[in-house]
Curated annotation (Swiss-Prot):
The gene is aldocb. The lineage of its organism: Eukaryota, Metazoa, Chordata, Craniata, Vertebrata. It catalyses: beta-D-fructose 1,6-bisphosphate = D-glyceraldehyde 3-phosphate + dihydroxyacetone phosphate. Coiled coil: none annotated. It is an enzyme of class 4 (lyase). Belongs to the class I fructose-bisphosphate aldolase family. The keyword Lyase applies. Homotetramer. It comes from Danio rerio (Zebrafish). The keyword tRNA processing does not apply. GO terms for cellular component: cytosol. This is Fructose-bisphosphate aldolase C-B. The record marks Y363 as: Necessary for preference for fructose 1,6-bisphosphate over fructose 1-phosphate. The active site is at E188, K230. One of its GO terms (molecular function) is fructose-bisphosphate aldolase activity. Substrate binds at R56, K147.
């Protein structure tokens, strides 16, 4: 039996667990506002807004200055490096603004995907070099949790054993480094929705990927109570001819999680994976109403599915800021209800029903 060398003190463990539980308190989820500079171009260009640092600041300000209604449905906000050091018009630091509202500040720490040689177009994620020092600095600058995204795709030949193992180990190494610096790691092994696979195939792959991740987290002595999982929902591929109900998606998703995710994990915050705003809320609601025992909070960590209507309403105009912020609040409240299984869909209306799917989505 391997000898156990304590990785974290009791105090460190308590701090990590407390942070994780605050983020996923009942009815709360995460606003993922950590789009990289390149990804912001994909958000701003379609609405005719130039992708400048100032326009990115103005847009994030519009989200972060939403009134107190979001305090009860947003438990954490994930920042991109640039955003962490930007200020509101009156000079208040964004991170401080969010913290003062009782919302936990997070930071994206990975440096993007790179090709994994010898595979059929698969990737691993870079960013471990210097991560410990960056985490120490981010902690000083107000961040209490972090995000790292690994990407896997489903095809006849993928994900390969190599890609599954490599990404699981990189996620575990990242998680371990974060915890040593007092930062709660969000573990995000995203299985892309690209392809024509059916629901069963996605469920099978999701189970294999999550099983590998939790084996790696155990091997790396990661304290599970001080982590969150950010998985894809189990859905059929975008090109699959069969359409499944939200109840079928919920059953497949909860079954996969129950088979692989230890109850010790503090929470599961789903990514929206290019679903429309409405779909993301309806599916989350069905997951919370799934008639199986669910030992973790099941909530959201949405980017596009919280922001699409707000972006459409804003279009870069100062006169539209109030309306845009209202759209964001509306989606945040909808998802806060869905996280408790209390969301009633009003049917797909306007921008909320638009698919947000991007092929081979890279941040």
């Amino acid at each position: 039996m391997t000898h156990q060398y304590p990785a974290l003190t009791a105090e460190q463990k308590k701090e990590l667990q407390d942070i994780a539980q605050r983020i996923v308190a009942p009815g709360k989820g995460i606003l993922a506002a950590d789009e990289s500079t390149g990804s912001m171009a994909k958000r701003l260009n379609p609405i005719g807004v130039e992708n400048t640092e100032e326009n990115r600041r103005l847009y994030r300000q519009l989200l972060f200055s939403a009134d107190e209604r979001i305090d009860k449905c947003i438990g954490g906000v994930i920042f991109f490096h640039e955003t962490l050091y930007q200020n509101t018009d009156d000079g208040t630091n964004f991170a401080q603004l969010i913290k003062d509202r009782g919302i936990v500040v997070g930071i994206k720490v990975d440096k993007g995907v790179v090709p994994l040689a010898g595979t059929n177009g698969e990737t691993t994620t870079q960013g471990l070099d210097g991560l410990s020092e960056r985490c120490a600095q981010y902690k000083k600058d107000g961040a209490d949790f972090a995000k790292w995204r690994s990407v896997l795709k489903i095809s006849d030949t993928t994900p390969s054993e190599l890609a599954i193992m490599e990404n699981a180990n990189v996620l575990a190494r990242y998680a371990s480094i974060c915890q040593q610096n007092g930062i709660v790691p969000i573990v995000e092994p995203e299985i892309l929705p690209d392809g024509e696979h059916d629901l069963k195939r996605c469920q099978y792959v999701t189970e294999k990927v999550l099983a590998a991740c939790y084996k790696a987290l155990s091997d790396h002595h990661v304290y599970l109570e001080g982590t969150l999982l950010k998985p894809n929902m189990v859905t059929a591929g975008h090109s699959c001819p069969t359409k499944y109900s939200s109840e079928e998606i919920a059953m497949a998703t909860v079954t996969a999680l129950r088979r692989t995710v230890p109850p010790a994990v503090s929470g599961v915050t789903f990514l929206s994976g290019g679903q429309s705003e409405e779909e993301a809320s309806v599916n989350l609601n069905s997951i919370n109403n799934c008639p199986l025992a669910k030992p973790w909070p099941l909530t959201f960590s949405y980017g596009r599915a919280l922001q699409a209507s707000a972006l459409s309403a804003w279009r870069g105009a100062k006169s539209n800021e109030k309306a845009a912020t209202e759209e964001f609040i509306k989606r945040a409240e909808a998802n806060g209800l869905a996280a408790q299984g209390k969301y009633v869909s009003s049917g797909t209306c306007g921008a909320a029903g638009q698919s947000l799917y991007v092929a081979n989505h890279a941040y």
